[in-house]
Amino acid sequence: MAEEFVQQRLANNKVTIFVKYTCPFCRNALDILNKFSFKRGAYEIVDIKEFKPENELRDYFEQITGGRTVPRIFFGKTSIGGYSDLLEIDNMDALGDILSSIGVLRTC
């Protein structure tokens, strides 16, 4: 069930972030991503509380990404990791270029 839950959300080749809103790392990751203007439907925030039991979901994250913690961030079906990974990409000033290259940002 966890596999289906996750894979359905990754199917549209968008930016997907799995979060728990009480997690400060999740809020920080959302702050980074919210600096960008995404195309409609190209960015999805998934609260892991939507899935029960949560441990099954975390086990599946570990299976496919190597980590159980949130946030779990995907560009398309590719996991980029968690908050520290996103922060590193952002600090290298590469995040905007990556998001643009995968076609999820609005163009003016």
UniProtKB/Swiss-Prot annotation:
The lineage of its organism: Viruses, Varidnaviria, Bamfordvirae, Nucleocytoviricota, Pokkesviricetes. The gene is OPG075. Keywords: Disulfide bond, Electron transport, Redox-active center, Transport, Virion. Residues 3-106 form the Glutaredoxin domain. PROSITE patterns: GLUTAREDOXIN_1, GLUTAREDOXIN_2. GO terms for molecular function: glutathione disulfide oxidoreductase activity. Induction: Expressed in the intermediate phase of the viral replicative cycle. It is found in: Virion. Displays thioltransferase and dehydroascorbate reductase activities. GO terms for cellular component: virion component. Its main location: virion. Belongs to the glutaredoxin family. Pfam families: Glutaredoxin. This is Glutaredoxin-1.
